Each structure stands twice: as structure tokens, then as C-alpha cells.
Amino acid sequence: LDAVEATLMGGVKAIQLREKDLSDYELVELGKKLRLLTSNYGARLFINSRADIAEQIGANGVHLTETSVHANEVKRNFPDLIVGVSTHSLEGAHLAETQGADYITFSPIYETPSKASYGPPQGLDSLRQVTQAVRLPVLALGGITLHRVPECLEHGAFGVALISDIWNSSHIKQHSFKYMQNFGGNTL
């Protein structure tokens, strides 16, 4: 939680809780702590795949995978939640839009060990194709670093989503601040 608070102190305005190996109880308990933190900093909290838990803890939204329940079904059952969907192709982006997503992530843009299972990097040209093809905010994800953000934005990304470059920093608060200060910090 200290690292999350450091990102929030650095100005990050959205956090996604993505802990697939926790029990429901553990997820709820961690979610409650994160909700308190994010609320204190005026940031949004998204829960990975679990709209029921997102609603239970008062999170702002849920983030779905391409293979999970459709966004419009989540919105029908949980109308107050912002619904995002992970996408890994132009077809997936179109599908997420037609199924009612509020935003999408598109990945991996660059080489990254955490997204290796999704195949080779999509690259900036694919990012541009997606951003021009859908009307949703598109967050570039995968291998994002400070020096790569400008080219993602130039290729139409609304913003970026990342883990490693901030988490692996020895100065999380300051590194988070650099992202938010230098690139406008678009948030959903």
C-alpha cells in the first residue's frame, strides 16, 4: 500500500486492482484499503474483472478482459461503474466498443515481459489504427516508459497505463509526478 500511496502522492489519478490470486475476502479487504487511499487523493479505483466487488467497495469502475463478460452486461447490472476492456487487436477494439466499453487499453505496444503471452509488440502503427477506428479513449499499455509516452500520444492514445516503469523506480512518487507533469495526466 505504501507504493500505491507514493504513486497517488505523485499525482496518479487512477489505480487498477489486479490481483488474480486473492480470495474474494482478500480482494474485498485490499479493495477497501485502496478505495480509502484513492478517495483521499481524488483518484479513481478500478477492479479487475469483478464488477460485484467493485460495486461492493465503492470503486469507480471495472476493467475486463477480451474474454470476460461483455461490457454492456456489466453496465446493465452495475450502471454506475465505468467499464474498461483490455484489447490486443483492431478487431478486439471494435468489439469492445460495440459491446459498450467506456474505454479500452491496447497492448502490448512495446516489448514487455508482462505481456509476452499476447504475442509480439503491436507497435505504434497499430496503436494509430485503433485510435482512428474507435471513438473510445484508448490507453496505450505494455513497455511504457517516460520517453515513450510522447510517441504514444502522437499516435492518438488518450493516455497510457503502466506498471513496471513506476513500480521499479527507486523514487515512485517523483517518477509518478514526472508522468503526470510532463504529459497532462489524462484520466478517465
Language-model features, listed with the residues they occupy:
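Nucleotide-sugar donor-binding patch of glycosyltransferase catalytic domains
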Residues: 116
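Glycine-rich beta-strand-to-loop/alpha-helix junction loops that act as flexible
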Residues: 139-144, 160-164
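Short beta-strands and strand-loop turn motifs
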Residues: 14-18, 105-113, 160-162
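Asp-centered catalytic/switch region of ABC-type ATPase nucleotide-binding domains
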Residues: 157
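Conserved N-terminal beta1-alpha1 strand-loop-helix module at the mouth
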Residues: 1-102, 119, 129, 135-136, ...
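Short alpha-helical segments enriched in small residues
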Residues: 121-124
